[in-house]
Each structure stands twice: as structure tokens, then as C-alpha cells.
UniProtKB/Swiss-Prot annotation:
Quaternary structure note: Homodimer.
NCBIfam families: N-acetylmuramic acid 6-phosphate etherase, PRK05441.1, PRK12570.1
Gene Ontology BP terms: amino sugar catabolic process; N-acetylmuramic acid catabolic process; peptidoglycan turnover
All copies of domain SIS, residue ranges: 55-218
Catalytic activity: N-acetyl-D-muramate 6-phosphate + H2O = N-acetyl-D-glucosamine 6-phosphate + (R)-lactate
Protein's name according to its UniProt entry: N-acetylmuramic acid 6-phosphate etherase
EC number(s) recorded for this UniProt protein: 4.2.1.126
UniProt keyword annotations, A-Z: Carbohydrate metabolism, Lyase
Its biological purpose: Specifically catalyzes the cleavage of the D-lactyl ether substituent of MurNAc 6-phosphate, producing GlcNAc 6-phosphate and D-lactate.
Record-linked PROSITE patterns: GCKR, SIS
EC supergroup of this enzyme: lyase
Other comment: A lyase-type mechanism (elimination/hydration) is suggested for the cleavage of the lactyl ether bond of MurNAc 6-phosphate, with the formation of an alpha,beta-unsaturated aldehyde intermediate with (E)-stereochemistry, followed by the syn addition of water to give product.
Organism: Pseudothermotoga lettingae (strain ATCC BAA-301 / DSM 14385 / NBRC 107922 / TMO)
Amino acid sequence: MSLSNLPTEMVNPKTRNLDARDTFEILKLINEEDALVALAIREVLTEIDKVVQMCINCLEKNGRVFYVGAGTSGRVAYVDAVELIPTYSLQEGVFIPIIAGGTQALGKSVEGVEDDEEGGKNDLFSYKPSEKDVVIGIAASGRTPYVAGALRYAKQCGCKTALICNVRKPLLAEYADVVIAAETGPEVVAGSTRMKAGTAQKMILNMISTTVMVKMGKVYDNLMVDVMVLNEKLRERAQNIVTHITGVDKQTAEIYLKKADYNVKVAVLMILSKNDVEECRKILQDQSNLRKALQIAVR
């Protein structure tokens, strides 16, 4: 399929004469088109669920999840992956973003790198992927050579693979165990896939990583109980989480957080189980899921 025939490259009939419209009308059109993104994602929830299960199985075997993309797709990958570390105390090197052109491409456009299929292979090769790992390629067009190189090599290494794209029947489907094709259609500005396509990619990656973290025991109720306390805002958030779960006041929450070295799970377990800090650490070392740890400790 030629580039001009891809839905993401087609002219959107709803936004013709865009340059002649007033500012508010342009904003209204963009908003209306953006509203279609969530509807497109609803159609691929089954495929997203398959990728979530794939990632959970991977992490349970101490594998890694790679995101691979070029341009907007690569930048979106970085935004999702790096935030998992402070939000869920995830160690570095578990969710790994790879962008065509390297990290310099995060802050500026590096031309031509998305066409380097061998570059995609080599960048993934540097991490020595194995059958324990999952590689998720991200490409609005479903055919980006850089992503193709990475996915093809991932299959050769025995990795589980997935493709997130915005077109039906993408060329790279042959290298993916699961294809998530969120058909977002023509952009407000024809071909500007940083808009609806990029938004869809960000939403899907958020859904995948968040659900994986929930199922890996890093959320209790709907609270980020593995949050890293790195600044004053996060310190107050940790206090609020402890207060919400245990019912103690913020001053008491702070006392227990200090005893627990600002580990929210340990602080909660200390308060509700009446065990000391070392005993709570031991319980959580054996059972990191707070809900299950509480069932063990509070009897």
C-alpha cells in the first residue's frame, strides 16, 4: 500500500479549509476528532488484554518489556516507560524504551533514522533480548522500517512481539504475535500522526503498563502503594495513601513512614498488623502484594 493510501495520510473531509476557519472553530474540530480516539481504542481492548497478559507472563519470568518506535511513537514510548520507575518503584531496565536516533531524538527531529531497518535490529541487539522478553513495536503507519528491523530480530530471538499501529492490515503484522490496530483515521492536518495516532499510542501504552503494574501488586485499591518518595509532593501523597488505607491521621502516617524509610507498604502493614518494621519487611519480601500481605499479617 502506498503512503497516500494509508488512512493516517488521507485528507480529512471534516477539516477542509482549516486555514480559513477562526481559532475557536479549529479548536472545536480538533477536540471532536480527539474524541474519536477513545472509541477506536475500545474496538481493540481484546488485543490490548492479550498484550497485558503477555507482559505479565514476561515479568513473572524476570523478563523485560521493550517499546520500540521512531519519532512521535518513540517519544511516547519514553514518556510511558520512564514514569513507571518513580510511580511504582520499578527498577530500571524492566520497561525499556528504544527510539530511532537514540536519546538525542527525544529533543529534536533526527531525519532519516526511521528508514534504517538495520538500525532497529542493532539497537535491540545491544540489549541481548531472549525468549523471556516482550518487544512492542509502535508505528502509526504499521510499516516503519526501523520498527520492522527490531520486530524481525525479536522474533528470531524467540521474544513475544506486539505491534501498536493505527491502520488495518499493517505490513508489520507478520512480525507480531498480537496486533493492536487502533484505527484513528485521517488527521486534522493530513499526515500529522503526532495528533490522533500519537494520542492513541500514548493511551494504549498507559493502559498496558498501568494494568500490568496493578496485576503485579503495585497498586492497592486504586492507590500507588509502591510510589517512590522523591520530593515534598510525593511525601504528602504517601501520607495521604497511608491515611486513606489505615484511617490514621497524617501526623501518625508520617511517623510510620519515617520508621519504614518512606516505604508505603511497610508503613501500612505496621499500622494494621501491629508488627515491627523488620517483621513487616520480611512479610512483604515473601509476599509483595499488599492485600495478600495484610491477609497474612492481620488475623
